[in-house]
Amino acid sequence: MEKQKNISIKKFANPLSFPHEFRTNLHKSTFLDASLLELPNISVDKTKNENNFSITDKILMESLKENEFKIREFIKNQESGNRVLMIDKNSLKELFNINDNQALDLIFNQYVQSTRPNLIRKSSNSSLNIDLKKEIKKKTKKSRKSFSRNSKLNNNDSKIDDKNDNYIDKINDINNFNSDIEEIFKKKKEIENTLKIPIGGNSFPIPVEFNNNNNNNNNNNNNNNNNYNNNIDNNNNNNNNNNNNNINNCNNNNINNDNNNNNNNDNDNNNINTVDNHDDDIINNSNNFNKNEYPSSNISPISPKSSISSFPTNLNNSINNTGSMVSDSLSSCRNSISSSSIDSSVASIPITIQSIDFEDKNIKSDQFKIISKSNIENTIETNPIPPFNQTNNQCEVQLQSHSLPTILKQPHIYKSKSFSSSINSNSKIKKIKKSRSFEIESKINLFDVINHIYLNLSKVGSEEQKITSVFKLYDIYDKGFISRDDLKEVLNYRTKQNGLKFQDFTMESLIDHIFQQFDKNMDGYIDFEEFKSELTINNENKVKEKEENTNYNFKEENIGIYTEKESFHSLKRYLKIEGSKLFFISLFFIINSILVITSFLNVHANNKRAIELFGPGVYITRIAAQLIEFNAAIILMTMCKQLFTMIRNTKFKFLFPVDKYMTFHKLIGYTLIIASFLHTIGWIVGMAVATGKPDNIFYDCLAPHFKFRPTVWEMIFNSLPGVTGFIMISFLIIMAILSLKIIRKSNFELFYYSHHLFIGFYVLLILHGTMGWIRPPTFWKWFIVPGFFYTVDRSFRLFKRTHRVEVLDYCLKNERVINLTFSKPPSFDYKPGQYLLINVPHISKLQWHPFTMTSSPLEDKIYVHIRVTGNWTKKLFRWLSIKKQLQQQQQLYNNIKQQNVLPDGSNFIINNNNNIDQIDLEIGLKPFRINIDGPFGSSSQYALKQKQVILVGAGIGVSPMASLLKDISLKKQRLQLLNQGDQIALEQSKNEITTKFGLGNLEKVHFFWLNRDQHSFQWFEDLLIDISTNGNSNLPKISINTFNTRVFPKNDVRVFMLWNGLDKLFKAQGLDPTTNLPFKTHWGRPNWDTIFQYYSKKYSGESISVFCCGPSQLSKELYEKCRYYTCLKTGGTKFYFHKENF
């Protein structure tokens, strides 16, 4: 039986290890990044050399060995159940005993950047955090350079010289506050009666404790807004109390309480509890505050346990001196309050500080006021304030250390001049924000540091030491064993770290499978011996593994070693693959070179008068003008999409590089811009030279065009060639800048609209040479043929190929992808992998965006998956979200009305809480129609021409591949149904069936899909399940290889137990727990060298087409692999690369 297994492994030495193909035979995955049985392949880890570690890693490894006991004791005392233990720089220094401040800064900053945002930050995407990251990155780069420079000079020293502590700037200088401010922070622990002002600050409730004697009190409040007096009369006859408050400028407030019933007077020391509400809660509390809920009782005095006088009196000076933090202490109102017995209850008093004078310790506000949210700029409502009890003629209101900076985060709500004068500029507020943000950011997770150290230790030393280091990654509390809770804690931490999510029952099943494998004695714990025995590889496997690893290293070492013969062979491969592209590029440069030579000779022979007037610069201007005319004409040919689609369907598709039209468009555009600048500069210099020439020379050259001699500025800015020339150069600059990749991705509309300036550019270019200063205009001769083709192409697309279709269904997936389903027009014939242009009139009537169709031509509907990235797609997503909501609510209303629950004529109100520009409810409920233009050809439509095809998609780039896979799957199903029917009828219609449902010579499709999110695999879940179930029933076969690139590779010691448990769970239930698909998802990025080596051997002598749609980095990598592994010898494998261009 063992021999049979070995034979199977040798036969199917597939580095991809497809579970649905080799589930019964393949017991060991030879995929390069790990194997399931070997777990973390420690004994053959390539990172054995200690010199591979950075200097900071070495320092941490040595420090952990020396201070391991102290660090573990600290972790035990601060035990955290979620593997998050935040420490600052000083704690890191004490725990690891790092005395070199320079090394400490470098280590700390490294982990500040690498610490997961979801573990330490609440808003890691805020602009403040982004600015902070940039600052830390800049400082870290400077620190690393200086640190490495110093370390090279001191290689013989065991430690870095302490004199270099001040060599670099401190990252935390922004966190050093004024000494007075630091004293305030120290005193915050002593404050018991505190008030926390939450973020937002429109109004905030202050819970105040009252002694309650009457439970049912009706309070009638009469407000006098003119005098800012509140009179409350409390008459408790029949449990009715009338309270009269007179609050004048927060001073000398009199409270008269008349009670006919017996009241108990309880004077207790009450603490003002902190309130932590968000903006919405604050507003709700303010609006729901009822004026008839003031209790009638004596308010217990607030115990002044911490003196206000101990705080600095001039906080404004502290702001100006430090520029980073405002004192968190606010003085109290000096209120003279008198009261009688009032019942005790808890009342939430909504107040907003209207004016704050930092020059005085007291609040100088005429009154506590509430600023209305509806009109925060103008409307101010005055609400009564319940009575306070007299306490030494002083009412204390104190703030915690983080309250006042929170107020300053929204300074626009305060309208007082005194407050505005205390904060002189927004820059100081930004500094305060930045310092507060940095205080949150400047901590690291101790578990991240320790895990990284043990990860490095697992790569050095003996096998025993490596396994010990791996064991300590899980036994972080040094118990000597791994309990179920410890393992669950580690797995939860790793799943969050890798962006994975599991249900609770899945995690429990996962742990059960791991303990079933590792816990040999079934005692509920995994000790070191059990852990070691499971990871130890027997001697036979070691020898075999060493041989395999040696062979692979030999292959890897030979990669990139080019002899003279190999270099020549590489050139031949490049010419074979890129022959047509190189031919047209060479032809392009040859034509431009010929134009340069002919223009030079023509000027030298026919424009001697112009040379005499303008100088030698005429040569530059005329050569550049000739290049502009040629390139401006042929660039139109690269914009004829319909023409390229027609060429793709003919036999000439291999002669013209139609897949490279974007490359030629950019090349011609660059040439046009350079020639335009040379032409402009040449004419400016020439005109300056012409000013020094006598009149006879000037009129001898330009006599027909000028009756009076103009100045140089008049020739430049007051002539038709000058004005049109500067406008054209402006158009080119705008189009070039807005065509940059960063702008196209962030704001496609700018790129799209700016490119329509080419219409004005051509009009001005025709007018530019009509005056004929040097020679008659000739651009129209170059323009007529390309302009004709472009006009026909554009007209054909505009009048013949534009369709208005109705969207039948749409699905919004995870706020990232929109799935549109619309009807297929009768004359809309397309091939799998082609794309179309979509226009949504409700969003924009002018914008057309390209999207690949993910449906098969055999279907009567068209499917399109749109990724939400730019402004247009975001507007579309918001509009469809509202439309979906309106439809659901309308359907609910119709269902209720059919059940006669609502009376006839009832109005059904739909609340619209989303923000979108003036959406009409009637339009939202009407059928959804869009305009489509196309189809247009793409490289993916060639996929069915080869026997072996490799499809690679990244993210939403899988769309053309999904169309191909769906088309292949449907054709196989149709052929299978036809084969089961009448054989005579099948023979008669064989040609028709082959044309419609034929798959050509295609034998197998190798599909690769790379994603950074486990939920992204659900976009085409039904298609993948159908293919995995029926994909190998007959030819062509389809193999699926999905990769989650965000997570660590499965051989990583940090996740090997997680991966192993998931593998056991997959074998038990037949579904991948991360994707719920019936095949295993690989972790990490694919190793393309191993994959191409495997295909090169298995399909020797065949041609393999590689189609890619994804990031430019992935396309470039695959392109290089195709070039390298293509063998031009007889019997060699040839790889042909194709890339999607939109």
From Swiss-Prot:
Heme binds at H665, H679, H755, H768. One of its GO terms (biological process) is defense response to bacterium. Its EC number is 1.-.-.-. Ca(2+) binds at D519, N521, D523, Y525, E530. Gene3D superfamilies: EF-hand, Nucleotide-binding domain of ferredoxin-NADP reductase (FNR) module, Translation factors. PANTHER family: NADPH OXIDASE (PTHR11972), SUPEROXIDE-GENERATING NADPH OXIDASE HEAVY CHAIN SUBUNIT C (PTHR11972:SF201). This is Superoxide-generating NADPH oxidase heavy chain subunit C. It comes from Dictyostelium discoideum (Social amoeba).
